[in-house]
Amino acid sequence: MKRQALAAIIASMFALAACGGEPAAQTPAASAEAASSAAQTAAETPAGELPVIDAVTTHAPEVPPAIDRDYPAKVRVKMETVEKTMKMDDGVEYRYWTFDGDVPGRMIRVREGDTVEVEFSNNPSSTVPHNVDFHAATGQGGGAAATFTAPGRTSTFSFKALQPGLYIYHCAVAPVGMHIANGMYGLILVEPKEGLPKVDKEFYIVQGDFYTKGKKGAQGLQPFDMDKAIAEQPEYVVFNGHVGAIAGDNALKAKAGETVRMYVGNGGPNLVSSFHVIGEIFDKVYVEGGKLINENVQSTIVPAGGSAIVEFKVDIPGSYTLVDHSIFRAFNKGALGQLKVEGAENPEIMTQKLSDTAYAGNGAAPAASAPAASAPAASAPAKSDY
């Protein structure tokens, strides 16, 4: 069963069919409309008060549009915690605890200096209280006490986004690890006042480790296993909450020549991610989601409860595999994604296979040919795991 599950994962990575799920790009018209609306809001705001703006938030892998204003605002963010059963893998379901109905929660994008007002609701069907700790907030608990909310209740609090960067938010109700392990995390981007450089495509990706009673691939609804979580022995390590969430039909898409920016988080609760895109080198990495930029990076560490921003230009077409390069997590536990790039081949950068000839090894006489061994009932394609 485990081999069959792995086969399904890897097969999806190399499917050549066209993929959906591409985040919608903001058009110039939409950007101009948003800018005009924001300008009108600012003009109508009484002196000494911040204009009030409703946040545009997005489910992964989509990213909210860039901030298109040069002044601070009060940004209103609505969040709802929902406990729901969803697919973890083929034939496998899990009772997730979520922000806004999915894992990760919606991505939030604000500007340095904004006041973020959070309206936090806990769905009446929830079985326990929930809250949110914003790593972007300065103050005890990151808002956890202010947002502690029973089922069927709504709490409101605000914080000022003092420092730019990419930050995790997560539930912090005891037992904290259990709430996070069930999927309660997401990212908030605090753009610097001057904004970020423009790129062609942006994607939102968060890794998480999940602890089920049954082993990976065990069918049916799988409950949370606290003993495995304490021992840090996950059955699943995945991007965006589910096996195959950004692979196969859900693959990310770009075109050759485009610059891609990925906002990468790690909800944990336990494992550190070694994030890597097979066949690419990160031109820039905003280390741990902060101001420091590293260049020409092959893999970057994303700590549990942390983040990184990676940028790279895709020069040639192909299927680029996203992995946690603690590699058994990728090919055996689900930490696989896919970026499909269309465009013209460029043999100056890389060719296809040019030849395939016999080799006897160190000048020795060629060995007599032997009958071909039968292929094992394995899961990976014969030619490559990539």
Swiss-Prot record:
Spans annotated as 3 X 5 AA tandem repeats of A-A-S-A-P: 367-381
The protein's required cofactors: Cu(+); Cu(2+)
Residues binding Cu cation 1: 130, 171, 179, 184
InterPro entries: Cu-oxidase-like_N (IPR011707), Cu-oxidase_fam (IPR045087), Cupredoxin (IPR008972), NO2-reductase_Cu (IPR001287)
Cell location: Cell outer membrane
Record: residues binding Cu cation 2: 135, 170, 325
Lipid attachment site numbers (N-palmitoyl cysteine): 19
GO molecular function annotation: copper ion binding; nitrite reductase (NO-forming) activity
Sequence repeat residues: 367-371, 372-376, 377-381
Stated family: Belongs to the multicopper oxidase family.
Name of this chain's protein: Copper-containing nitrite reductase
Originating gene: aniA
